[in-house]
Amino acid sequence: MEGDGDKLQSAVIVPRHIALVMDGNGRWAKIRGKERCEGHAAGVDALRVALRAAAGCGVEYLTAYTFSTENWNRPEEEVRALMGLFVTAIMNEMLDLMTNNIRLLAIGDFSRLPEDVRESLEKGIRETAGNTGLTLVLALSYSSRWEMTDVIRRLARKVRDGSVEPEDINVDLVSDHLSTAGIPDPDLFIRTGGEKRISNFLMWQMAYTELFFTDTLWPDFDADCLKAAIEEYSSRERRFGKTSEQIALRENKY
């Protein structure tokens, strides 16, 4: 992995957390006369490249939208193939994750996942728990609407049980009940494949995230593409509701 981040200029501000929608696997396969499952397999290879590049650039967290709750509505054959691919990919990538000191986490409604997928995830999370490099978060059977509904349900139970007062519910308490509790909000969102929407992904967490869209299909997204996105992110002014003058004044203090 050495050298993956060498081409970034020293002045570039690297996002701590990147959220990623890996779109375009099916179209990539169709253009080449291949089956959709072959496009998804190529997408796994692209994620491996992106992981190494992100770690080389100094990114601490990368959350990949791997399978949404809406994806359960895809043809049964494709869903079955994707589930098998998840198991194979996790098993095959374990050595690479360990070698590159990458920690694996996952978020989503795991109750809908097949048992072998859950077992593979649990094994990967357990075996990489001690790694201290980049954290890869797989969003599997995930959507923001599912997540917020789950948060509301759990907080409602706590109010009913008397452990939480309605007046105690604030932004911090909601954040503490999210699937991503303990993980910083994304600084940069990247979506490949040409679509310009976030597709029910980390909607609470991305309140102030910088959005980057590219026409590049996911299997073609390489290290140079990632670095270009980071450099674009670095050129933007993140104000978080403040004015440019307030940001400049704050920066001048340091």
Swiss-Prot record:
Substrate binds at residues 24-28, 36, 40, 68-70, 72, 74, 191, 197-199. GO terms for biological process: polyprenol biosynthetic process. The active site is at D23, N71 (proton acceptor). Its cofactor is Mg(2+). Signal peptide: none annotated. Binds 2 magnesium ions per subunit. Homodimer. This is Isoprenyl transferase. It comes from Porphyromonas gingivalis (strain ATCC BAA-308 / W83). The lineage of its organism: Bacteria, Pseudomonadati, Bacteroidota, Bacteroidia, Bacteroidales.
